[in-house]
A protein has these predicted regions:
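Short beta-strand-centered segments that line the small-molecule binding cleft or hinge
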Residues: 129
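N-terminal secretory/targeting leader peptides
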Residues: 29-126, 135, 143-342
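C-terminal segment of classical bacterial N-terminal signal peptides
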Residues: 16-25
Length: 342
């Protein structure tokens, strides 16, 4: 009788759970496994490159909130998919998720070159405001058309590490083999007199070591994580001013997203949005930590002031901005949308 009464008492509880849409615990056999790829060094949820940590935080929280219905396998360091192939893999549904420098795909989707347009973004808050403005909605639509969904918005500032001489003003770039990370950034550096070599950030160490590159522009996180301080003699940081801001979001294949239940989709988007505060905090910390790490390694540390920034911006408008406006479909309209966000 006691067992029967206990079971009867549980009936309304079970019914309430069903009605509320709360996910029920999943067995290992029933769980959906989602694979996440990225090109950055692997670590733990508490230590290492913040991008790897963010991915692990996302996976842990989504698995917790879905009661194990969704589980994740994380592949750092380009171990599953090569860096520049990740968006294509998302588009075809061959890969579930990635944290990815979107401008890497500017050849396939020219419009996304605006996400590493030199001197367009001038501070983090401006970049994050794109999300709810027309430029952000247009970017979301473009990615949707390519079977890709933005889960977490991440903007990163960056600087330049060099082993020949300091690079502060545009003229310092003349005659050097340089890497800007995207078409528009490379156009600026070319206009400044640099010779462009395009490599993903996880190959910059070997490129600089072998002499393929004299200078590397990349995010503060990558300048530290890929240990370029072991090779550089000078670094110009982003802690005061920089023309280098890159959109590097956490993305999911729409094929994967559409295969989730409405409740699972809701959890994925909520967790993704919740990690944006962690991302911006980590990036600002990395901008400062970069100077500390490089200084400790004996590298000469430099900063950019407003006057120098305006020199780069003038050259960017004459080169990368103009090319984008003239040669990309709706390029002028997209640039106007972006510049409307302050």
């Amino acid at each position: 009788m006691k067992i029967k009464s206990t079971l009867l008492a549980l009936i309304p509880v079970i019914a309430a759970l069903v009605m509320s849409g709360t996910p029920s615990p999943a067995s290992a056999a029933d769980a959906k496994v989602i694979k996440i790829s990225h090109q950055f060094p692997g670590g733990t949820i508490d230590k290492g490159d913040f991008r790897d940590r963010l991915v692990r935080m996302f996976a842990q929280e989504v698995e917790k909130r879905t009661h194990g219905q969704l589980k994740f396998e994380i592949y750092p360091g380009g171990s599953l998919v090569k860096a520049k192939q990740q968006l294509d893999a998302l588009s075809t549904g061959a890969l579930d998720m990635t944290l990815y420098p979107l401008a890497y795909s500017g050849g396939k989707i020219p419009e996304v070159n605006i996400t590493l347009m030199p001197a367009l973004i001038t501070h983090y808050e401006q970049g994050y405001r794109w999300k709810n403005k027309p430029i952000g909605k247009e970017l979301t639509r473009l990615l949707d058309e390519n079977n890709v969904k933005i889960i977490t918005w991440i903007w990163q500032a960056g600087g330049v590490a060099s082993h020949n001489k300091p690079i502060i003003v545009p003229a310092d770039t003349k005659g050097l083999k340089v890497r800007g990370a995207g078409k528009s950034m490379n156009q600026l550096l070319e206009a400044a007199g640099g010779a462009i070599s395009s490599v993903p950030s996880n190959e910059t160490y070997s490129a600089m070591q072998s002499g393929v590159l004299d200078a590397v522009w990349t995010s503060s996180a990558s300048l530290v994580s890929f240990r370029l301080y072991e090779l550089a003699k000078d670094v110009t940081t982003a802690r005061k001013k920089t023309f280098w801001y890159m959109f590097e979001p956490l993305l999911m294949s729409k094929s994967t997203y559409d295969s989730l239940t409405p409740e699972q989709q809701k959890i994925v988007m909520q967790v993704g949005a919740s990690l944006e505060k962690f991302a911006i905090k980590s990036c600002k910390e990395d901008d400062k930590r970069l100077a500390e790490v490089y200084g400790k390694a004996g590298v000469h540390v430099h900063d950019m002031d407003e006057k120098t920034f305006q020199m780069w911006r003038k050259l960017a408008k004459e080169s990368a901005w103009k090319d984008f406006e003239d040669n990309v479909k709706d390029g002028k309209k997209l640039m106007e949308m972006a510049q409307a966000v302050k």
